[in-house]
């Protein structure tokens, strides 16, 4: 049951990003940056002073795609998780924005670790982290890179995180619209939940030597 709930959450997330990003994104669209420093309360309750974002690192998956959907392009992305690049190649985003394929995917590890000095040297001015990465947040703060933490372990936290990243980008209205798209996608998928639970499940035997 828990697996099905998580699968539904992420299926709805993927669907919302695909539809919302596709209808609101163009390669030539110019991002609108916040006019001044804003105070953001992230998912952990931390209050973060966030200057206008120009080049950001996005550690969690699939949040580089969320930033793309909110901003309309990849212009303010600077460093992404390697998994985000793997998801980009051969999929719809590759056809929509060639700049995404040029982003750095080495300064963030597969295990979500960060190379703080490399990020600073690359001109990264802000970062999105998972909610448990307090040590990484402190490390980046010490070198002048503010961070916000997000979480998508539940529908409520996911939608709050949309708004947090939207505020970070100065795209609060877009974040609210993305939440509406997500609600629609989630409702569409959960409408078939009973059918999925009743369906015959394959039995798989794992052998280990």
What is each of the regions a protein language model found here?
Residues 54, 74-77, 123-126, 143-146, ...:
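Loop/turn elements at helix/coil->beta-strand transitions in domains of secreted/extracellular proteins
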Residues 6-9, 22-66, 173-207:
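Bacterial Sec-exported substrate-binding components of ABC uptake systems
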Residues 17-20:
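Bacterial Sec-type N-terminal signal peptides, specifically the leucine/valine-rich hydrophobic h-region
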Residues 43-47, 113-121:
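Short, well-structured alpha-helical segments in soluble
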Residues 136-173:
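Charged, glycine-enriched surface loops/patches
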């Amino acid at each position: 049951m828990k697996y099905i709930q998580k699968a539904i959450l992420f299926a709805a997330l993927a669907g919302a990003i695909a539809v919302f990003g596709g209808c609101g994104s163009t390669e030539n669209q110019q991002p609108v940056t916040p006019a001044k420093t804003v105070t953001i309360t992230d998912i952990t309750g931390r209050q973060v002073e966030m200057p206008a974002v120009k080049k950001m690192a996005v550690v969690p998956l699939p949040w580089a795609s969320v930033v793309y959907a909110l901003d309309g392009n990849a212009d303010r992305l600077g460093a992404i998780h390697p998994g985000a690049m793997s998801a980009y190649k051969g999929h719809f985003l590759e056809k929509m924005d060639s700049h995404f394929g040029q982003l750095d995917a080495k300064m963030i590890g597969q295990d979500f670790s960060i190379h703080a000095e490399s990020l600073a040297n690359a001109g990264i001015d802000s970062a999105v982290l998972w909610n448990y990465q307090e040590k990484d947040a402190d490390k980046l703060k010490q070198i002048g890179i503010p961070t916000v933490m997000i979480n998508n372990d539940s529908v409520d936290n996911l939608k709050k995180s949309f708004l947090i990243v939207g505020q970070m980008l100065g795209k609060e209205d877009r974040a609210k619209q993305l939440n509406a798209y997500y609600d629609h996608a989630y409702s569409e998928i959960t409408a078939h939940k009973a059918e999925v639970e009743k369906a015959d499940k394959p039995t798989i035997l794992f052998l280990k030597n």
